[in-house]
Regions:
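Hydrophobic core
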Residues: 28-40
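N-terminal extracellular ligand-recognition/capping segment immediately after the signal peptide
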Residues: 76-115
Length: 270
C-alpha cells in the first residue's frame, strides 16, 4: 500500500513539474511575442509619424514648398512637389533669382487661409505638370508679376486668378494649358488700376469671365459659357460650339467669299 501511495505521489509531482514547465514555456513565449511585436510595431509607428519632405530642388528635399523656393538658384530654379501639401506660398526666391518653375508632379497644393500662390511684382512663375492648385475659399493665384501656366488643375470657390496693373508695375500672364474651375475665373486685385496683360491660348475653363477686363485677349481654349467673351476675342477667331460636352471652343475663322469665280479664256478681257 505504501508503495502505491509513493508512486501516486511521484506521479502527481511529475505532473505538477510538467504543468509548471508548460506554463513557464507559455509565459516565456507570450512575452517573447509581445517583445517582438513591440520591436516591429513601434519603429513602424515612429516612421509613420515622422514628417516627410514635400518639395525638392535639384537633389535636395525640403519640408515646405516655401523653404524650397528660398533655396532655388540660377542653376536649379525648379521646385518639384513630392506629395500633397497644404500651404500658401509666395514666390520669393533668393535675390539673384528672378523666376522659378513649379512642377506640380501629380500632387496638390492646397491653400492655407490665404491665396494659394502669390507672385509679387518683378517675379516670374511658370507652372507645369499635372496636379492641382486648390484655393478653396481663397483665390488660387494672385499675380503682380509674370505668370506662365502650362498645365495643372486650378479650382476656387471665389475668384480663381487675380491680376494687377498699378502705376509702377503690371502683371503679365500667358496660359496655354490646364483646367480652370471657379465661379469667376479672372479678376483684378483690389488696388489694381487695370488688369495687366493676360492672354489665354489654351486650356479648359469652367466659370464666368467678367466684362471690363480691357487687356485680356482670348486666342484659344474651351469655355463653358460665351457670356462676355466676344470683346476679348483676338482677331480672326470665333467661338465654335462643341456638341459633345456643351463647351465652346475658340478657333480660327475660315475666310470664304460668296462671289462667283470667272474663268477667262486666253487673250480675252473683261
Amino acid at each position: 500500500m505504501y508503495k502505491h501511495e509513493k508512486q501516486a505521489v511521484e506521479r502527481l509531482q511529475s505532473n505538477h513539474i510538467h504543468m509548471l514547465s508548460t506554463f513557464s514555456t507559455a509565459i516565456i513565449a507570450f512575452f517573447l511575442i509581445i517583445s517582438l511585436s513591440g520591436t516591429l510595431l513601434f519603429p513602424m509607428m515612429a516612421f509613420a509619424d515622422e514628417p516627410q519632405p514635400v518639395a525638392q530642388v535639384g537633389n535636395t528635399t525640403y519640408m515646405s514648398v516655401q523653404d524650397a523656393i528660398g533655396h532655388t538658384s540660377m542653376k536649379n530654379n525648379t521646385v518639384t512637389l513630392l506629395t500633397d501639401t497644404t500651404e500658401s506660398i509666395t514666390i520669393t526666391p533668393s535675390k539673384v533669382v528672378r523666376g522659378i518653375t513649379l512642377e506640380l508632379n501629380g500632387h496638390a497644393l492646397n491653400a492655407s487661409n490665404a491665396t494659394a500662390i502669390t507672385v509679387p511684382a518683378n517675379m516670374q512663375l511658370t507652372i507645369t505638370g499635372s496636379g492641382m492648385v486648390v484655393g478653396g475659399d481663397n483665390p488660387a493665384i494672385d499675380c503682380r508679376g509674370a505668370l506662365r501656366i502650362q498645365g495643372g488643375n486650378f479650382t476656387s470657390n471665389t475668384t480663381l486668378m487675380r491680376f494687377a496693373e498699378t502705376g509702377s508695375t503690371s502683371s503679365e500672364a500667358s496660359i496655354s494649358a490646364g483646367t480652370f474651375t471657379a465661379p469667376t475665373l479672372i479678376g483684378m486685385l483690389n488696388d489694381a488700376e487695370h488688369l495687366g496683360y493676360a492672354s489665354i491660348r489654351g486650356g479648359e475653363y469652367h466659370g464666368a469671365i467678367p466684362a471690363g477686363l480691357d487687356t485680356l485677349v482670348l486666342m484659344g481654349g474651351s469655355f463653358s459659357t460665351t457670356e462676355n467673351l466676344t470683346p476679348y476675342l483676338a482677331d480672326m477667331v470665333g467661338l465654335i460650339p462643341n456638341g459633345d460636352d456643351g463647351m465652346f471652343n475658340i478657333s480660327e475663322l475660315a475666310i470664304s467669299s460668296d462671289y462667283p469665280t470667272v474663268a477667262l479664256e486666253q487673250g480675252s478681257t473683261l
